[in-house]
């Protein structure tokens, strides 16, 4: 059984723990998620099963959509509500000023990852160094904030809720921290929910509790190709598919498109390839 599972992750559990429970329930040989959610976060987690794990790289690079709440007036060492408060501020939350500040965080920006993150420094995870009290210096990386919308603003509680679509490599925790810094009153991420990965919605997901209690959990496993919704497809005959399965490139006529494609032998999905200049090259194969 090879495929993908859409789980609505609950709060208070790591993404790795979710994967292990799913793997045990399905008695799968291999399983892996396509982008971690912190324990404090809820929402969409894509878990790939067995041979489908070969396609993880394509999901990791997809944009993600989040709804999140920022608590202003303080900063924490982890940039979220689970961390230790390291700085407090007396200033008020001005909603009009907040709206203006958001303009600086849309589009292509430089963002420094949180010290408590999985980024590596000389071969070691940043969070490993941070937990030991060592100074963590991470370089800013270029990310894209495709959209950033203010959903609500509560000056009395010093909280605001946002909706954002962010490119791969972006951290909502850093976004919350940076917005607070720009306002001059500090801020940290209080809550986070992942709503979408590319065109895949959390509304399509099953809760972890429902999945684990199911007597037929296999019914929730989807063909992995059904999740590549914006990638066009190329259908090959048996001879052409045989060449691709041998790792060879083939010429494709009547296709002006260039980029990633789903490859099918008749109606059977066999993998992801790249089409360029009329030449189809295999990238990852299911068989």
Curated annotation (Swiss-Prot):
Matching SUPFAM superfamilies: Pseudouridine synthase (SSF55120), PUA domain-like (SSF88697)
Active-site residues annotated for this sequence: 38 (nucleophile)
Enzyme kind, highest EC tier: isomerase
Catalytic activity line of the entry: uridine(55) in tRNA = pseudouridine(55) in tRNA
CDD domains, per the entry: PseudoU_synth_EcTruB (cd02573), PUA_TruB_bacterial (cd21152)
Source taxon at top rank: Bacteria
Recorded GO MF terms: pseudouridine synthase activity; RNA binding; tRNA pseudouridine(55) synthase activity
InterPro entries on file: PsdUridine_synth_cat_dom_sf (IPR020103), PsdUridine_synth_N (IPR002501), PUA-like_sf (IPR015947), PUA_sf (IPR036974), tRNA_psdUridine_synth_TruB (IPR014780), tRNA_sdUridine_synth_fam1_C (IPR015240), TruB_C (IPR032819)
Annotated GO biological process: mRNA pseudouridine synthesis; tRNA modification; tRNA pseudouridine synthesis
Function: Responsible for synthesis of pseudouridine from uracil-55 in the psi GC loop of transfer RNAs.
Name of the protein in its database record: tRNA pseudouridine synthase B
Originating gene: truB
